[in-house]
Protein backbone atom coordinates (compact mmCIF):
# COMPACT_ATOMS: atom_id res chain seq x y z
CA UNK A 1 0.00 0.00 0.00
CA UNK A 2 2.85 2.38 0.83
CA UNK A 3 4.45 1.79 -2.58
CA UNK A 4 1.16 2.50 -4.37
CA UNK A 5 0.64 5.64 -2.28
CA UNK A 6 4.04 6.96 -3.32
CA UNK A 7 3.16 6.35 -6.96
CA UNK A 8 -0.22 8.04 -6.57
CA UNK A 9 1.51 11.09 -5.09
CA UNK A 10 3.93 11.28 -8.02
CA UNK A 11 6.98 9.95 -6.18
CA UNK A 12 7.77 7.41 -8.89
CA UNK A 13 11.35 6.87 -7.80
CA UNK A 14 10.31 6.14 -4.23
CA UNK A 15 7.53 3.86 -5.39
CA UNK A 16 9.93 2.04 -7.72
CA UNK A 17 12.31 1.37 -4.83
CA UNK A 18 9.47 -0.04 -2.72
CA UNK A 19 8.25 -2.29 -5.54
CA UNK A 20 11.78 -3.61 -6.04
CA UNK A 21 11.67 -4.85 -2.45
CA UNK A 22 8.22 -6.37 -2.93
CA UNK A 23 9.27 -8.12 -6.14
CA UNK A 24 12.08 -9.85 -4.30
CA UNK A 25 9.40 -11.43 -2.12
CA UNK A 26 6.94 -12.20 -4.97
CA UNK A 27 8.94 -12.17 -8.21
CA UNK A 28 6.12 -13.63 -10.33
CA UNK A 29 3.22 -11.55 -9.03
CA UNK A 30 1.64 -10.09 -12.22
CA UNK A 31 0.09 -7.08 -10.48
CA UNK A 32 3.39 -6.08 -8.92
CA UNK A 33 5.34 -6.68 -12.13
CA UNK A 34 2.83 -4.58 -14.08
CA UNK A 35 2.94 -1.67 -11.65
CA UNK A 36 6.74 -1.78 -11.46
CA UNK A 37 6.96 -1.87 -15.26
CA UNK A 38 4.67 1.13 -15.60
CA UNK A 39 6.76 3.03 -13.06
CA UNK A 40 9.89 2.22 -15.07
CA UNK A 41 8.14 3.45 -18.20
CA UNK A 42 7.11 6.72 -16.54
CA UNK A 43 10.70 7.22 -15.38
CA UNK A 44 11.92 6.52 -18.96
CA UNK A 45 13.84 3.45 -17.77
CA UNK A 46 12.84 1.66 -20.91
CA UNK A 47 15.20 -1.32 -20.75
CA UNK A 48 13.98 -2.16 -17.26
CA UNK A 49 10.36 -1.65 -18.30
CA UNK A 50 10.80 -3.84 -21.37
CA UNK A 51 12.23 -6.68 -19.30
CA UNK A 52 9.23 -6.60 -16.96
CA UNK A 53 6.65 -6.41 -19.75
CA UNK A 54 8.35 -9.36 -21.46
CA UNK A 55 8.17 -11.20 -18.14
CA UNK A 56 4.41 -10.61 -18.09
CA UNK A 57 4.15 -12.06 -21.60
CA UNK A 58 6.13 -15.11 -20.50
CA UNK A 59 3.74 -15.49 -17.57
CA UNK A 60 0.77 -15.03 -19.96
CA UNK A 61 -0.54 -12.29 -17.69
CA UNK A 62 -1.87 -8.84 -18.60
CA UNK A 63 -1.02 -9.62 -22.21
CA UNK A 64 -2.74 -6.69 -23.91
CA UNK A 65 -1.09 -4.16 -21.64
CA UNK A 66 2.29 -5.87 -21.95
CA UNK A 67 2.24 -6.15 -25.75
CA UNK A 68 1.11 -2.51 -26.00
CA UNK A 69 4.03 -1.17 -24.00
CA UNK A 70 6.51 -3.53 -25.63
CA UNK A 71 5.38 -2.09 -28.96
CA UNK A 72 5.81 1.49 -27.74
CA UNK A 73 9.30 0.82 -26.43
CA UNK A 74 10.38 -1.01 -29.58
CA UNK A 75 8.95 1.66 -31.87
CA UNK A 76 10.85 4.35 -29.98
CA UNK A 77 13.99 2.23 -30.39
CA UNK A 78 13.42 1.99 -34.19
CA UNK A 79 12.74 -1.75 -33.97
CA UNK A 80 9.81 -1.34 -36.30
CA UNK A 81 8.97 -4.90 -37.33
CA UNK A 82 9.01 -6.03 -33.70
CA UNK A 83 6.88 -3.04 -32.70
CA UNK A 84 4.29 -3.82 -35.37
CA UNK A 85 4.16 -7.45 -34.25
CA UNK A 86 3.68 -6.38 -30.62
CA UNK A 87 0.98 -3.84 -31.44
CA UNK A 88 -0.71 -6.44 -33.61
CA UNK A 89 -0.84 -8.83 -30.65
CA UNK A 90 -2.97 -6.45 -28.55
CA UNK A 91 -6.49 -7.84 -28.41
CA UNK A 92 -9.78 -6.02 -27.67
CA UNK A 93 -9.03 -4.01 -24.54
CA UNK A 94 -8.52 -0.43 -23.47
CA UNK A 95 -5.17 -0.48 -25.29
CA UNK A 96 -6.64 -1.92 -28.52
CA UNK A 97 -7.41 1.26 -30.44
CA UNK A 98 -4.20 3.10 -29.62
CA UNK A 99 -2.11 0.02 -30.39
CA UNK A 100 -3.54 -0.26 -33.90
CA UNK A 101 -3.17 3.49 -34.49
CA UNK A 102 0.47 3.31 -33.41
CA UNK A 103 1.10 0.30 -35.64
CA UNK A 104 -0.37 2.16 -38.59
CA UNK A 105 1.79 5.20 -37.82
CA UNK A 106 4.92 3.04 -37.83
CA UNK A 107 3.85 1.66 -41.21
CA UNK A 108 3.12 5.15 -42.54
CA UNK A 109 6.58 6.29 -41.50
CA UNK A 110 8.43 3.24 -42.82
CA UNK A 111 6.36 1.50 -45.49
CA UNK A 112 3.49 1.97 -47.96
CA UNK A 113 -0.28 2.18 -47.94
CA UNK A 114 -0.48 -1.42 -49.19
CA UNK A 115 1.35 -2.58 -46.06
CA UNK A 116 -1.21 -0.79 -43.91
CA UNK A 117 -4.00 -2.67 -45.66
CA UNK A 118 -2.20 -5.98 -45.17
CA UNK A 119 -1.77 -5.23 -41.47
CA UNK A 120 -5.43 -4.39 -40.93
CA UNK A 121 -6.61 -7.32 -43.07
CA UNK A 122 -4.63 -9.62 -40.78
CA UNK A 123 -6.01 -7.87 -37.70
CA UNK A 124 -9.58 -8.36 -38.90
CA UNK A 125 -8.95 -12.07 -39.40
CA UNK A 126 -7.50 -12.30 -35.89
CA UNK A 127 -10.13 -10.10 -34.19
CA UNK A 128 -13.31 -10.48 -36.28
CA UNK A 129 -15.52 -9.04 -33.54
CA UNK A 130 -13.62 -5.74 -33.90
CA UNK A 131 -13.70 -5.66 -37.71
CA UNK A 132 -15.84 -2.52 -37.99
CA UNK A 133 -13.55 -0.57 -35.67
CA UNK A 134 -10.51 -1.84 -37.55
CA UNK A 135 -11.91 -0.65 -40.90
CA UNK A 136 -12.41 2.78 -39.34
CA UNK A 137 -8.89 2.86 -37.90
CA UNK A 138 -7.44 1.79 -41.24
CA UNK A 139 -9.31 4.51 -43.12
CA UNK A 140 -8.39 7.17 -40.57
CA UNK A 141 -4.73 6.19 -40.67
CA UNK A 142 -4.76 6.72 -44.46
CA UNK A 143 -6.45 10.13 -44.38
CA UNK A 144 -3.41 11.83 -45.94
CA UNK A 145 -3.95 9.54 -48.96
CA UNK A 146 -7.58 10.30 -49.69
CA UNK A 147 -7.89 7.69 -52.44
CA UNK A 148 -6.64 4.87 -50.23
CA UNK A 149 -8.73 6.16 -47.33
CA UNK A 150 -11.89 6.18 -49.45
CA UNK A 151 -11.11 2.67 -50.64
CA UNK A 152 -10.83 1.50 -47.01
CA UNK A 153 -14.14 3.16 -46.16
CA UNK A 154 -15.73 1.50 -49.20
CA UNK A 155 -14.53 -1.93 -48.09
CA UNK A 156 -15.72 -1.26 -44.57
CA UNK A 157 -19.16 -0.15 -45.72
CA UNK A 158 -19.46 -3.18 -47.98
CA UNK A 159 -19.16 -5.26 -44.81
CA UNK A 160 -21.04 -2.87 -42.48
CA UNK A 161 -23.40 -0.83 -44.69
CA UNK A 162 -25.26 0.78 -41.79
CA UNK A 163 -22.18 1.88 -39.83
CA UNK A 164 -22.59 5.49 -38.71
CA UNK A 165 -18.89 5.93 -38.01
CA UNK A 166 -17.84 4.63 -41.44
CA UNK A 167 -20.50 6.65 -43.27
CA UNK A 168 -19.58 9.80 -41.38
CA UNK A 169 -15.85 9.30 -41.92
CA UNK A 170 -16.30 8.70 -45.64
CA UNK A 171 -18.53 11.77 -45.88
CA UNK A 172 -15.78 13.92 -44.40
CA UNK A 173 -13.28 12.59 -46.95
CA UNK A 174 -15.74 13.39 -49.74
CA UNK A 175 -16.21 16.87 -48.30
CA UNK A 176 -12.48 17.53 -48.16
CA UNK A 177 -12.21 16.44 -51.80
CA UNK A 178 -15.03 18.76 -52.85
CA UNK A 179 -17.42 15.88 -53.65
CA UNK A 180 -20.48 17.53 -52.15
CA UNK A 181 -23.05 15.16 -53.66
CA UNK A 182 -21.26 12.06 -52.34
CA UNK A 183 -20.81 13.67 -48.92
CA UNK A 184 -24.48 14.57 -48.73
CA UNK A 185 -25.55 11.05 -49.72
CA UNK A 186 -23.54 9.47 -46.91
CA UNK A 187 -24.77 11.92 -44.29
CA UNK A 188 -28.37 11.47 -45.39
CA UNK A 189 -27.94 7.69 -45.09
CA UNK A 190 -27.15 8.28 -41.41
CA UNK A 191 -30.14 10.60 -41.00
CA UNK A 192 -32.41 8.04 -42.67
CA UNK A 193 -31.55 5.70 -39.79
CA UNK A 194 -31.46 8.34 -37.07
CA UNK A 195 -33.12 11.68 -37.94
CA UNK A 196 -31.99 13.07 -34.60
CA UNK A 197 -28.25 12.47 -35.03
CA UNK A 198 -27.10 15.94 -33.99
CA UNK A 199 -23.50 15.68 -35.21
CA UNK A 200 -24.67 14.64 -38.68
CA UNK A 201 -27.32 17.36 -38.85
CA UNK A 202 -24.66 19.90 -37.95
CA UNK A 203 -22.08 18.52 -40.37
CA UNK A 204 -24.52 18.51 -43.28
CA UNK A 205 -25.84 21.97 -42.47
CA UNK A 206 -22.38 23.45 -42.09
CA UNK A 207 -21.17 21.90 -45.35
CA UNK A 208 -24.22 23.22 -47.21
CA UNK A 209 -23.48 26.65 -45.75
CA UNK A 210 -19.88 26.64 -46.93
CA UNK A 211 -20.26 24.80 -50.23
CA UNK A 212 -23.64 25.94 -51.57
CA UNK A 213 -26.16 28.75 -51.30
CA UNK A 214 -28.80 26.47 -49.77
CA UNK A 215 -28.74 28.59 -46.62
CA UNK A 216 -32.38 28.19 -45.56
CA UNK A 217 -32.10 24.40 -45.78
CA UNK A 218 -28.82 24.49 -43.89
CA UNK A 219 -30.33 26.66 -41.15
CA UNK A 220 -33.17 24.19 -40.59
CA UNK A 221 -30.71 21.32 -40.21
CA UNK A 222 -28.45 23.19 -37.79
CA UNK A 223 -31.38 24.52 -35.75
CA UNK A 224 -32.52 20.92 -35.28
CA UNK A 225 -29.01 19.96 -34.22
CA UNK A 226 -28.87 22.74 -31.63
CA UNK A 227 -32.29 21.81 -30.27
CA UNK A 228 -30.95 18.28 -29.76
CA UNK A 229 -27.63 19.46 -28.26
CA UNK A 230 -28.33 22.83 -26.64
CA UNK A 231 -25.26 24.81 -25.70
CA UNK A 232 -22.91 22.91 -28.01
CA UNK A 233 -20.42 25.60 -29.10
CA UNK A 234 -19.56 23.91 -32.41
CA UNK A 235 -23.23 23.83 -33.38
CA UNK A 236 -23.74 27.41 -32.21
CA UNK A 237 -20.83 28.41 -34.42
CA UNK A 238 -22.44 26.67 -37.40
CA UNK A 239 -25.81 28.30 -36.77
CA UNK A 240 -24.25 31.72 -36.26
CA UNK A 241 -22.39 31.32 -39.53
CA UNK A 242 -25.46 30.37 -41.57
CA UNK A 243 -27.41 33.24 -40.00
CA UNK A 244 -24.62 35.53 -41.21
CA UNK A 245 -25.01 34.11 -44.71
CA UNK A 246 -28.74 34.86 -44.44
CA UNK A 247 -28.00 38.46 -43.42
CA UNK A 248 -29.29 37.99 -39.87
CA UNK A 249 -26.35 39.76 -38.26
CA UNK A 250 -27.78 40.35 -34.77
CA UNK A 251 -28.73 36.70 -34.23
CA UNK A 252 -25.46 35.62 -35.83
CA UNK A 253 -23.30 37.78 -33.57
CA UNK A 254 -25.11 36.64 -30.44
CA UNK A 255 -24.57 32.97 -31.23
CA UNK A 256 -20.98 33.42 -32.34
CA UNK A 257 -20.07 35.40 -29.22
CA UNK A 258 -21.54 32.67 -27.04
CA UNK A 259 -19.72 30.00 -29.04
CA UNK A 260 -16.44 31.93 -28.90
CA UNK A 261 -16.70 32.36 -25.13
CA UNK A 262 -17.19 28.61 -24.70
CA UNK A 263 -14.80 27.53 -27.45
CA UNK A 264 -12.13 30.15 -28.27
CA UNK A 265 -11.24 28.36 -31.49
CA UNK A 266 -9.69 30.27 -34.42
CA UNK A 267 -12.43 29.09 -36.78
CA UNK A 268 -15.08 30.60 -34.51
CA UNK A 269 -12.95 33.75 -34.33
CA UNK A 270 -12.85 33.87 -38.13
CA UNK A 271 -16.64 33.77 -38.28
CA UNK A 272 -17.21 36.27 -35.48
CA UNK A 273 -14.72 38.69 -36.98
CA UNK A 274 -16.44 38.54 -40.35
CA UNK A 275 -19.84 39.25 -38.79
CA UNK A 276 -18.42 42.25 -36.94
CA UNK A 277 -16.72 43.47 -40.10
CA UNK A 278 -19.99 43.25 -42.04
CA UNK A 279 -21.57 45.54 -39.44
CA UNK A 280 -18.83 48.14 -39.84
CA UNK A 281 -17.18 47.35 -36.50
CA UNK A 282 -13.75 46.97 -38.01
CA UNK A 283 -11.63 47.51 -34.90
CA UNK A 284 -13.53 44.81 -33.00
CA UNK A 285 -13.24 42.46 -35.96
CA UNK A 286 -9.48 42.96 -36.19
CA UNK A 287 -9.10 42.32 -32.46
CA UNK A 288 -11.01 39.04 -32.74
CA UNK A 289 -9.00 37.90 -35.76
CA UNK A 290 -5.73 38.85 -34.10
CA UNK A 291 -6.69 36.88 -31.00
CA UNK A 292 -7.36 33.86 -33.20
CA UNK A 293 -4.02 34.23 -34.99
CA UNK A 294 -2.28 34.52 -31.64
CA UNK A 295 -3.53 31.00 -30.99
CA UNK A 296 -2.75 29.61 -34.46
CA UNK A 297 -0.60 32.00 -36.47
CA UNK A 298 -1.29 30.43 -39.86
CA UNK A 299 -4.93 29.49 -39.42
CA UNK A 300 -6.23 29.17 -42.99
CA UNK A 301 -9.82 30.32 -42.40
CA UNK A 302 -8.79 33.55 -40.69
CA UNK A 303 -6.10 34.23 -43.28
CA UNK A 304 -8.56 33.60 -46.12
CA UNK A 305 -11.12 35.97 -44.58
CA UNK A 306 -8.74 38.87 -44.04
CA UNK A 307 -7.23 38.38 -47.50
CA UNK A 308 -10.65 38.29 -49.17
CA UNK A 309 -11.76 41.40 -47.30
CA UNK A 310 -8.47 43.22 -47.88
CA UNK A 311 -7.78 43.62 -44.17
CA UNK A 312 -4.36 44.60 -42.85
CA UNK A 313 -3.75 43.55 -39.26
CA UNK A 314 -1.21 45.40 -37.09
Annotate each PLM feature.
Residues 1, 35, 69, 102-103, ...:
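Canonical tetratricopeptide repeat
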Residues 25, 59, 90-94, 125-127, ...:
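Structural marker of alpha-solenoid helical repeat scaffolds
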Amino acid sequence: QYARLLGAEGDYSGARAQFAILLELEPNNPDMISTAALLDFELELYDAALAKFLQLIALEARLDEAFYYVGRIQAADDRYSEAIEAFGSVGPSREFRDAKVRAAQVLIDTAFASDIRQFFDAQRRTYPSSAEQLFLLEAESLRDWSGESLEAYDRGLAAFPQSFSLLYGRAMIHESEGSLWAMEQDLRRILAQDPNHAATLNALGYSLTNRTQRYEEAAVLIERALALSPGDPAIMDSLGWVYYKLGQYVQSESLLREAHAALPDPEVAAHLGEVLWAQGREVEAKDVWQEGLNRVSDHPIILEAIDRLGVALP
